Amino acid sequence: MALDGERGEQEEEKKKKKKKKKRKKKEEEGAEKSSSPFAATMGEDDAALRASGRGLSDPWADSVGVRPRTTERHIAVHKRLVLAFAVSIVALLAVTMLAVLLSLRFDECGASAAMPGTDGGLGGFPERDSNSSFPGSARRNHHAGGESSQRESGEVGTPGTPSAQPPSEEEREQWQPWTQLRLSGHLKPLHYNLMLTAFMENFTFSGEVNVEIACRNATRYVVLHASRVAVEKVQVAEDRAFGAVPVAGFFLYPQTQVLVVVLNRTLDAQRHYNLKIIYNALIENELLGFFRSSYVIHGERRFLGVTQFSPTHARKAFPCFDEPIYKATFKISIKHQATYLSLSNMPVETSVFEEDGWVTDHFSQTPLMSTYYLAWAICNFTYRETTTKSGVVVRLYARPDAIRRGSGDYALHITKRLIEFYEDYFKVPYSLPKLDLLAVPKHPYAAMENWGLSIFVEQRILLDPSVSSISYLLDVTMVIVHEICHQWFGDLVTPVWWEDVWLKEGFAHYFEFVGTDYLYPAWNMEKQRFLTDVLHEVMLLDGLASSHPVSQEVLRATDIDRVFDWIAYKKGAALIRMLANFMGHSVFQRGLQDYLTIHKYGNAARNDLWNTLSEALRRNGKYVNIQEVMDQWTLQMGYPVITILGNTTAENRILITQQHFIYDIGAKTKALQLQNSSYLWQIPLTIVVGNRSHVSSEAIIWVSNKSEHHRIAYLDRGSWILGNINQTGYFRVNYDLRNWRLLIDQLIRNHEVLSVSNRAALIDDAFSLARAGYLPQNIPLEIIRYLSEEKDFLPWHAASRALYPLDKLLDRMENYNIFNEYILKQVATTYIKLGWPRNNFNGSLVQASYQHEELRREVIMLACSFGNKHCHQQASTLISDWISSNRNRIPLNVRDIVYCTGVSLLDEDVWEFIWMKFHSTTAVSEKKILLEALTCSDDRNLLSRLLNLSLNSEVVLDQDAIDVIIHVARNPHGRDLAWKFFRDKWKILNTRYGEALFMNSKLISGVTEFLNTEGELKELKNFMKSYDGVASASFSRAVETVEANVRWKRFYQDELFQWLGKAMRH
C-alpha cells in the first residue's frame, strides 16, 4: 500500500509538471498577442463588452464546451482567415502612417463636425437644461467611428502607438489644454471689439467679438471661455501680410466652460493674431451673465437687460479670456430698439440711428480691465446727474417713478463726496470720465462694482426719506461706500487670482466704515460699529473647525464661487484693521497709496501688498516683516484665544498663552486638518492695567509662542488686566476667574472707566468663551447686569447680538421663561428711561442723535422680543391705529419692530393687512420690512402659505425669497416648517441659487443654524448624504454648527438654568 501510494504521488507530480508547461506556453502565446496594439484593443473591447453585459459573464463562459475543429477543410479556412487578417493589419498600418504624415488627429476630425456648413453645424440657442449638450459642443462624427465617444467624454485620441503609461499632467495639458481649470497662458488678449444686438421682445441677442491676441508660446489650439452661447462662425487671422489661419474646427467643452478652436497650423510665438467669433445666446431669466429683469409702471410691465459677470459669468455673454489676470481694453457697441437706452463702462461716443427704429450706441474704449467687471445694460430708465470737483460725471439711473420721487438723490449726493474722499485718501484720481449707478429690481447681490457702471439692487440704493429709517439709511450708505471703494481696490488694481479675493473685498468692507466716518464723523463707525457688525459676526463663523484660511487655494472651478464668503469679506476687513492699527494709520495710508500707484491698471497678489507696506514702515524707521506676520493670519484658518493669568509671582509677572479657538472642541478632534497641528500666530497684544479709578497707558506685547511670561508694571492684588484694547486685534481674550470678577465689579461700580469699545468687547468675548466651554455659563450673564446703567449704543448692540443665538437655543425649552425673565429684568430700567420715539422726523433722517436713536431702537427690540407687556401693548396700539385710520403714524426707526410684533400678537386680519400693504407700496425700503414682518406670525398655516408664495417670482423677488425662508426658520413657531420646506424644495432652490456665489450658503446657514436637537441633527446628516457633493462646504459648516448646538445643550444648559434659578430668587 505504501509503494502504490508513492507511485501515485509521482504520477500526480508528472501531471502537475505537464499542466505547468502547458500553462507557461499559453502565457507566452498570450504575451505575444498582447504585444500587438490591435490585440490589446480587442482585449479591452472584450472586457468592455463583458462589463456592459453584452459579453458572456464568467459563469456562463465556464459552462460553454469547446468543440475541436481539426479537419483539413477547417485548417485551410483558418489559413485564409489568417492571411486576410494579416492583409488588414498591413492596410491599417498604412492608413495610420498616412494619418501621421498629414497630422490628422481624431479630435480634429470630431471638431470639424462642428463647423458651419458641415455635418453637425451649429444653429439655434443654447439649452437651459444643464444636463443637455450645448449647441456647438463636441458632436459625434459618424465617419470617425469610435473616436467620437472619446471626444464626448473628454478623452481625445492621438496618433501613434498607444503608450503603456498614462500621460503625465504636463503632457495632458499640452494636448488637451481645454481640460485644465486655468487657461494655459499661451495666448493673451490685448483688445476686444464687441458688437451686440439685443432683441428684447424675445429675450435673445446676437454678438460678434473680435479679439486681438498675442501668442506667447506656439500652439495649435485657441482656448478661451464660453458657456451657453451658440457659436456660428470662427475665424483666425494674422496681420495683413499673412492673412487667414485655416481653422480645422471648433467645439465647446462644457466641463471647463471653454471654446476650443483647432487650427490647421501652429500659431507662432511673439506674433499677434485676430480671433473673430459670431454667436448668439439668450437674455436669461436667471441672475447671472446677461439676464433680464422687469418692473411695473402704470399697470404696464417693462423689461430691462443687465449683466452680472463676477466671478466667472462673462463667458455666458461673450467668448472671452474670463480670468482676472487677462486684462485687455474693450470697445463695445450695442444695437437696440430706440425706445431703450444702453449703458456700459464708458460713455457713449456716437449713436447711429436707423430708419427702422433701431439705434447703435458705440462706447469709448476702456482702459486695461478684467472681464468680470465689464458691464452693460439695456433699459428705459431716467436719471439724475451731478459732477465732482475733478470733473467726473456721476449719474443715477432708476425707474422713472423713483427718479421723480427723488429716491436716488441721497445716493447721488454721497457718491460725489465719496469719489472726492477716495481721490484724496489714495492720492490716485478716479480713472474714468464717468460713474453710473444703476438701480435694478432684481439682482443676485446687494451691488456689483463694475468699473464706471455699478449696479445695485433697488433696496440698497433707493431711499425715500418719508418711509426710511436711520438703520435703512445706514445700510444704503455702507453699500455705496463699499462699491465706490472697489473702483480702486478691484477695478484699478485687481487680484491675480481668486485665492486672494479678500484683497478687494476685505479692503472694500473695511472702507465701508472709514468712508462712512468721513460722511458722518459723529457716528464713529470704524471704532465702534465695526466690532459688532464685522468682527463679532465673522468670529462666529471662523470659530468653526470647518472654516478655511482667508487666502485659500482654488483648484477646481467650483472652488471659485466658494471663496466669496464672509471669511474673505469680513475676516479680510478685520485683518486689514488690525494691520492699520499696529502699523499706525498714517503709515498704513501711505503704504496703500504706493500699492495703488505701483499696480494701477494691473494685477497684484498678497505679497505685493506686504512688500509695499513693509517698505512704508521701513521709510518710517520701523523694521517689521509684514509678510512673516500676516502669512500666519491669512494662510491659517481660524484665530487664537489669548489667556492671561495675572500676577502669578511676586514680581508682577503674568503668563500669556495662545491656542486655536474652536466653538465645538469635539469638532476639533474630528477635523483632519487640525489633527497633529500646532497653530501659532504672531499676535500684537495691547494691554492695560487698571483699578476702580485709574487705567494705565497702553502697552503692546508681541506674542509668538504657545506660552510666555511678561513683567507688567502697576500690577497689584486689587488691579485688573485688560487685553486687546478696543478689540483692534483679531483674537479673543480670556482671563482667570479672579480677573473676570474684578472686571465685572468695575463695570457695575463705574463702567465708564472702560471705553465703549472695551465694554462691547468684554460682552462678546464672555458669551463666546462660555459658549465654547472656556468659561462658566454665568460669567456673561453676570456681565450684562451692569447694562441698566449703560447709556451707549455699542455695548447694548453687542449684548443683543450675543443673546440672540442663546435665545434661539433655549426658546423651545420648558423652562425658557426663567431665561426670558432674566433678560427682561436687565432691559426694563433702560426701556422705561428711553421710552418710545415720537414721529417728528420732518423729513430728515440724519440727526445728531444717531447713537441715541439707535440705542432706543435696540432696547425696544429687546423688550418686545422678550415679551415686555408695555412694549407689546404699544406695538398693538400703533398697528390698530394704522388699520383704523389708514394713516401710518408709526415712527420710522421702529416700524419693523412694530410690524413684526403686531403680526405676532394680533389675528389673521392684521397679517392680511400687512400682505396687502406689501403689494401696494412702491417704496423699496417699506416693501422689505413689510415682507419680513409677515414671517413673525404665530399661525403655522400663514407661515406655510408664505413659504409657498416665496417661490413665485411674480410675488416675491428671487433675492427676497431666501430672506423669507430664513426669517421663518428664526421664528420658533416656524423653524420646523422652514426646515421641511427647505428639504422638500431643495432641488428648486439649488437650481435657482446654486451658481450665485454665497446665496446658497446663506440659505443653508440661515435655515439650519438654530436646529439643536439630536433628531434635527440626524435629519441634517441624512439630507446631506442624499445630496452628496452639492454645496458640501456649506453643509459641513451647518452640520458642525448643529453638532455644537446639541453639545452645548447636553453639557451646559442645566448649568445655565441652575444659575438663573438662583439669580432670580435673589
Swiss-Prot record:
Zinc recorded as keyword: yes
Region (Disordered): 1-43, 118-176
One Pfam family recorded for the sequence: Peptidase_M1
Key words of the record: Aminopeptidase, Disulfide bond, Glycoprotein, Hydrolase, Membrane, Metal-binding, Metalloprotease, Phosphoprotein, Protease, Signal-anchor, Transmembrane, Transmembrane helix, Zinc
Entry's EC annotation: 3.4.19.6
Hydrolase found in the keyword field: yes
Cytoplasmic side: 1-81
Subcellular location: Membrane
Topology term for the membrane: Single-pass type II membrane protein
Record PTM Phosphothreonine, positions in chain: T71
Active site location: E483 (proton acceptor)
GO biological process, one term: proteolysis
Transmembrane stretches, start-end: 82-102
Function: Specific inactivation of TRH after its release.
Family membership: Belongs to the peptidase M1 family.
Name of this chain's protein: Thyrotropin-releasing hormone-degrading ectoenzyme
Source organism: Mus musculus (Mouse)
Upper taxonomic lineage: Eukaryota, Metazoa, Chordata, Craniata, Vertebrata
